[in-house]
Amino acid sequence: MKDIRNCKVNFCGREYRNAKKSRGNGKMSHNHQKKIAVINDMSGFGRCSLTVSLPIISYLGVQCCPVPTSILSNHMALGDYFFDDYTDRMEAYIGKWKKLGLKFEGIVSGFLGSKEQIEMVIGFMKEFCSGRTKVIIDPVMGDNGRIYSTYTEEMCEEMGRLIEYGDIITPNLTECCRLTGTAYRGGGWEEAELHGMAEKLSMWGPEKIVITGIPQGEFIANYVLEKGKGTKMIQVHKAGTERSGTGDVFSSIIAADAVNGVDFCRSVKKASDFVRQGILVSEELQIPSTDGVCFEEILYTLERK
């Protein structure tokens, strides 16, 4: 038989190169391809949560395996919506994955609707984490200085417990202030203050932290801390208005890049630039801010490695 391992194959106008070595040593397995489990809600319309993560993570060459926490007809910012809580069904859903013996290179948690769901996520991590698994936690709790009405004081405390399991966490400025007990303000942050908050978060366990959405005059900044590598402020020019789902776009890129071994600062810069460009395209197309970021229009521009 002809050796095709190094052959180039043309498919739908694209060129692919087969892997030089067989990953499975001749045995079929669910676990030969990189996979990320994404625990989040599913909104049918509005470009957020799982409907954002599925295409972006897949485009970056990693299989995206959703764990829905709830099903919504559309993003809650649109007002009237259908909502179906999946808390009571999550355990049975996850149980089937246990039977399949699935292994994950990445686990991502996003918006969680109750203390019970936070407990389930912790249980999921304990069950499926291995030495090769990267855990990315987006501690979705609020924005613009306000904690979401669904988040009780008890849930905020539980979120603090959840991030202890993270390798990477991506809180926005509001969430960072809540987690560290820091008074929120809309601007004028000194780098030393951001460093102090990032250090507090790192003491809980995460190796890599990015505090997102920090207003800095005409810029939006993301403050990065990596244990053993120091800190960095990554800025992009402000663009358009705030939009739903930008955090989900950002964390999806960070997660796929982490599994693919991309440098963290490089990944943060890539994600920041992509979100900004998506906002500009959305403004150009006159898409309402509640509809999220039109990332589909520019997905092909996203660097895969």
Segments the model singles out, each with a brief description of its role:
Residues 29-137, 141-149, 295-297, 301-302:
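Conserved N-terminal subdomain of the carbohydrate kinase-like
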Residues 149-231, 241:
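Conserved phosphate/ATP/ADP-binding segment of small-molecule kinases
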Residues 44, 231-245:
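Short pre-catalytic strand/loop immediately N-terminal to key active-site residues, enriched for Gly-Thr
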Residues 2, 6, 18-21, 27:
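Polybasic, lysine-rich low-complexity intrinsically disordered segments
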Residues 178, 241-264, 268:
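Short, small-residue alpha-helix embedded
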Residues 265-305:
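Charged C-terminal helix
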